[in-house]
Amino acid sequence: MATSQQYGSAGQVGGPSAPQPAPQQPIASGSGVSAGGLPAPANGSTSTPVSILSTSVTLTARQLAVFKPAKVFSEAVKRGKDITSLAYDAKGDYLLTAAEDDVFNLYSCKKGKLTKTFYSKKYGIDLARFTHKPDCILHASTRGDNSIRFHSLQENKYLSYFRGHESRVTSLQMSPVDDTFMSAAANESVRLWDLKSSKAFGKLRMQGHGVVAYDSSGQVIAIALNERAAIVLYDIKQFEKAPFLTIRIDDSAALSQISYPPRYPTITYIEFAPGAGNTILVGTAGGVHYLIDAFTGALRRRLVGGQGGRIGLEPEGLAAVDAYAASEKEAEEEKGNEGEGDKTEEGTEEEKKATPRSMFVPGAGISGSECCFTPDGAFIVSGSATGQIFMWQVPTDFREVDNGRNLDPVAVLHGHQGPSRCVAFNPRTAMLASAGRKLAFWLPDLDEDV
C-alpha cells in the first residue's frame, strides 16, 4: 500500500497482503514489571494489573475486556480545563499531553510518573505530536498567529515556527517516514511542511473542519471534507493535482431514522489501519464512527455503542462535560475549604483569548483524539461523553452483503472519571491512556480470567 495506483480499483486490493498475526504469547505475570514498565506492588499483590506485551503479540478481546485504570493523575490539568491531545513517542517510553491550561506534560510509561512539565502561556498548545527525534515535538497554537511550533523538550525552547495558517489549526500529523508533516485549519487550508523550512511546500484550500492523515508508507494522504461528507486521497507527490480517489460516506439510510434530512456528524479524526492499511477509521463527534474500505471506498461498518451506551462527544457531549464540571465545582464547594484552590479561576487575559476548536465549526466536538486503532490494527478504541471506553474488533473478512452494518463493541470499560476526550494506545506495550479532566493509565488486570 505504498502508491496511489494500489487504491481505487473496485474489487481489487492491489497492495501487499496484510501481515499474518503472530502466534499468541502468554502475558507475563509476577515479573515485578507491569505494562509499560510500571512497577508492580511491593508486596507482590496482583491487584494492580500486570502485563508485558511484545510488539509481535496480537491483542485479544478477552485481554481488552479486563483493562482497568492502574494509575489516575487527578491533577494532570488545572481544574475546569481539559487535556486535548495525547501522543506516545515511537518506542512507547513516554506519553505527551497537551491541555487547555497551556501546559504540556511528559510522562514516563515505564515508571508511571510525571517526568517534566512545560508551559506555553503566550501561545497556548494543542495537537502535540512527537517528531522522529524523541526529544522534539510539534504543536499547534491556540491563539496569536495560528502558527505551528517546533519545540525541544531537552532544551525547553522553540527551534522554529511554521506560519501561514489564517485560522486555528484543527489537525496536525507527522509523516511516518521522514521529517515532513501536514496540517489543516478550519475553513482555510491543508498545508504540507518540512521541518527544515518555515514555508509550506504544498497548499490546498478547503472549507469546514479540516482533518488529515498519512498512510503507513507516507506516500498517500487522506483529507476529510466535512461539507461533502467525503474523504479524498492524494498521492503526496502529486498533491497539486486532483485526488486519485474520492470516498463519499453514504450513511443516509441510518441517519435519516434519527433526523430528516439526515444530518451527518462532523468528522474529527481519520486514521489508516496499521500495516496494510486497507481500511480507514473515520471518527466523528456524533454517535457513530465508520470503517471505510481504503481501496473501493465502501462503507464497511458503522461503529456504535450498542447496549453499552452512546459514543461520541457531540451534541450531548458538551452537556455531559458541563454537567461533570458542575458536579466537580459543587463537590469543591461542599468541602468548605478556603484558599486559592477554591476560588473560581477566571484565567489570564491571554487565556481568555484562546478559542476552542469546536467554536470554528458547529458540531465539531471537543476533541480530535477520541478514537484510534490498537497497534496491531485488530481493534478500535473510543472515548465518550460519559467516560466509558468502547472497544470494537475489526472484522477480518469483510463481505459486501454486510456493508454498512452496525458493529457493536466487544468491550466497554468503566473507570474514567468524567468525559474521556482523548484515548491513545501505547505502540509497544499493553497500555491505554485516556484523558479529559483527568489522565488515566489502563493495564489489563491479570487477576481476571484472560
Where do the PLM segments sit?
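Loop/turn segments within WD40 beta-propeller blades
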Residues: 86-92, 129-134, 172-179, 206, ...
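Inter-blade linker and blade-boundary elements of WD-repeat/beta-propeller domains
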Residues: 53-78, 113-120, 157-164, 168, ...
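Blade-level signature of beta-propeller repeat domains, shared across WD40, Kelch, NHL, RCC1
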Residues: 421-450
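Hydrophobic beta-strand positions that form the internal "hydrophobic ladder"
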Residues: 95, 137-139, 181, 221, ...
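WD40-repeat beta-propellers
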Residues: 104-109, 148-152, 172, 190-194, ...
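Conserved strand-to-loop turn within each blade of WD40 beta-propeller repeats
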Residues: 98-101, 140-144, 184-187, 224-227, ...
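Blade/loop signatures of beta-propeller domains
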Residues: 14-68
